[in-house]
Amino acid sequence: METGFNSVASMSDGDFLSLYSALAESGIKCEAANCFLPGEMSVTGKNVDYDALYKFIEKGFERCKKLGAETVVFGSGRARDVKDGYPLRECYLQTVRFLKETVAGFCDKYYIDLAIEPLCRQETQVINTLKEACIAASMTDSGRIHVLADIYHMLESGDDYANILAVGSDLIHAHISYPVSTGRHKRVYPNEKYGFDYSEFIDNLKKVGCPRVSIEGSTDDFENDLISSYEVMKKFR
């Protein structure tokens, strides 16, 4: 399963113990965590509180490690968006410095990789494509900071599936959904009934050896949607 880093880091000790115990009893492994930072915890602009970031991230990494997580996803569009009239380039560089100087050390300490998630421009102006994420990852000089491909954000940003091949082995995680608005939701659990063609996305993930893919989307009927989604997920084998 993939949990929420922000939620795990913000839990009371009692709530975390309950989560840990429930997972242990179920036998389900928490392999990844997304939703890295709350929107108000900025890594760009003039009001970056590095002390608060450090404490929050350390607590989250420590807890995610206990849950068994191997990968943390850095989306957090509001946290890394352009702020305070800063130029886009400066906000991009601030984001890279944050990853290099604050996050990379925790990745090494807890043996957890971080995947930079390119987001569509409606959610952030900083890192919108796989290429931009690759450049950011390389600038951190960390062997544990890599890239994620999300089918919804790729379509929204016009990021061609072929660009997955250019990322190569640096692509360590992926998100899948039915990436078309259904009215109430902008993306939902994948389902063959929608007739969406995942073949190129799936084939390219396989070609680069992407080790993990998870569902990121909304559902109004979790149990039945999960069963239907399994038919799509099996194609990644």
Predicted segments with their positions:
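Short histidine/acidic/glycine/proline-rich micro-motifs that form metal-
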Residues: 4-10, 120-123, 151-155, 218-222
